[in-house]
Amino acid sequence: MLSSILPVDSFSVVALIATFLLVSLGLHFSFGLLNIVNLVHGEFILIGAYTAFQIQDWYGSSLLGMLLAPVVAALCGAFAELILIRRLYMRPLDTLLVTFGLSLVIRQGIQLIYTANPKQVVDPIAKSIMFVGFNVPLWRLVIVVIAIALVVLWLVINQTALGIRWRAVVANPELAEAMGINSNHVRTSLFAAGCGIAGLAGALLAPINTLSPQFGLRFLINSFLVVILGKPGSIKGMLVASCVLGGSLGVLQFHISTVYAQMIVLLLAIIATRLRPLLKKA
């Protein structure tokens, strides 16, 4: 059997790469495109996860909760952009402070409502298949497919009139305004889209993780690592960074503890970030 030949569960590595891609795609909109140091990104992942849990609690359907999670997160994101962030573009230190404060408010609010006790979102499929000798939960396969679909969807939208308007505002807001594009509306839609994707990521990842008010923090650092290493604003760079970081972490976890594996991945990301300018000069 291939499981006796392969040193690691190859599909688990692929699933981890998809997880890195999924949680960082929302940050690609706010940090990569809008240049917002978005420390509340993890809490929008949290909002999506708890939306799925709450809908499951009310109606007994985690799948319905997953469908509504990105809508709720996007609406919360649009509200946050309108009230707090809109006046802080081009002021990165101020956005850092505001998003950090908002993350604390959301996290503590969720803890007050749901307590710190762990919650669980039910796997809507709860089945598995054999893949090269390994038992693969079908829900992880769903996560991989959705992550790929979101990237393809973004690449397609990027070539439409809507995508051109978005890129125009990101590149030169003043010129875009002169051409009749409402930059405020575009920024709100971009930020809301990023929050919606973060909420979807949280809802999709909730069934394979224990849910708590600290849930979003698990993904915040890795999201920033992927976007920064892949070059902010570059979807292709983000794909490569997800493969490198997620793949490295997935392989290392089979040989050493997760804590040490994460430390090594962080060190690799720092080294790669430092070497990139030198490689460009060469």
Q: Can you annotate each of these PLM segments?
A:
Residues 16, 132-211, 235-240:
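Helix-loop-helix "hairpin" substructures at the membrane interface of multi-pass membrane proteins
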Residues 5, 90, 94, 113, ...:
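Cytosolic-side transmembrane-helix boundaries in multi-pass membrane proteins
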Residues 2-13, 157, 161-163, 188-230, ...:
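Inter-helical junctions in multi-pass inner-membrane proteins, predominant
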Residues 1-22, 51, 59-65, 91-96, ...:
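Membrane-interfacial amphipathic/re-entrant helices at transmembrane-helix boundaries
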